[in-house]
Amino acid sequence: MATFELYRRSTIGMCLTETLDEMVQSGTLSPELAIQVLVQFDKSMTEALESQVKTKVSIKGHLHTYRFCDNVWTFILQDAMFKSDDRQENVSRVKIVACDSKLLTQ
């Protein structure tokens, strides 16, 4: 299964990358193994989001910027509101990156 490396830019992905870098620098982990861990992280995040997340959320906000490049949409919203069945969250700025899932099956 092919995966995107999108989730490496999430908070948990950046923490994992930083920790792996520290382990490689200290000699605790080989660079090859660190890469394998990141590839597995990409696969695990994709599988978890496909199978475990069932909540639907609506998003409203002011579109500041949008871009479409290499089959990837990027939207930057300002004063966005995320609303689910039981909760509402307001954020001043959010970046949404969306990829065509058909690319994963190629």
Swiss-Prot record:
Coiled-coil residues: none
UniProt keyword DNA-binding present: no
GO biological process: transcription initiation at RNA polymerase II promoter
Keywords associated with the record: Nucleus, Transcription, Transcription regulation
Subunit-structure text: TFIIA is a heterodimer of the large unprocessed subunit 1 and a small subunit gamma. It was originally believed to be a heterotrimer of an alpha, a beta and a gamma subunit.
Family: Belongs to the TFIIA subunit 2 family.
Protein's UniProt name: Transcription initiation factor IIA subunit 2
